[in-house]
Amino acid sequence: MSNSQKNVLGEDLEECSKNPLTGWFRDGCCNTDENDRGLHTVCVKVNDEFLEWCKEAGNDLITPHPEFGFPGLVDGDNWCVCASWVARALEAGIGCSIYLKKTHLNTLKLVPIETLKKFAIDLS
């Protein structure tokens, strides 16, 4: 893993969340490597609609699983979500707030930058 991973804007990747502690490496960032098959690369500010949709679709982000270092999420938490789940949610019409500066460049393999920008909350 590189120490200077990039975001979807081509800049240094910013921290997503330390509380709850997120990331494939549980380092607070949406860093990734070849072992991250799910591409946990999109920094999302989750909301109840997104969490409920994910749970109903088979990806329960609400229930804590301490054995995996997963605290369970609530409305307003920031979390590194799998790019494929974000793509599915957006296709289903489920909106979520996305931080582009905190979202890893590899996300663009699954979700176009134009789509991400529609839901971005950190563009000025």
Predicted regions and their residues:
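Extended boundary segments
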Residues: 1-49, 113, 120-122
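Short, basic/aromatic beta-hairpin or loop at an interaction surface
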Residues: 45-60
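Short alpha-helix capping/helix-loop boundary micro-motifs
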Residues: 62-69
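Glycine- and charge-enriched low-complexity intrinsically disordered segments
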Residues: 104-124
